Amino acid sequence: MSIITESDAPKRAVFLGTALADLSTFPPEARRKAGKDIGDLQSGVMPPDWKPMPVIGAGAGEIRIQGKRAFRVLFVARFHEAIYILHAFEKKSQATARRDIELGRARYQALLRAREGGDQRPT
């Protein structure tokens, strides 16, 4: 018999703003990969293709999904209560678009403000 303690249990995944709706527009294979990678994060395992995104904020990262097209999922996994999905988008050029970085940063800042106010589920 195995006992799962709270610290062993997967973290919740909380999607901020339109991140879930945006992710749902990904092609099926990219959605499956994103789902698996988010599941890995929830279990405390970093996905195989990710990179830190300090430009978004401390502890922010980017899941990279490659195929015929490139997709990205911005996340924060540093808080004990949940994995926060900040933004999901299709990458159309070599550099991440300024608007995607700014949106990720704005949602990260909103998350910090909500946590300071005791609300652990910002919108």
Stretches found by the model and what they are:
Residues L74:
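Short, surface-exposed charged micro-motifs
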Residues M1-A70, F79-I83, E90-T123:
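Basic, Lys/Arg-enriched alpha-helical interface segments
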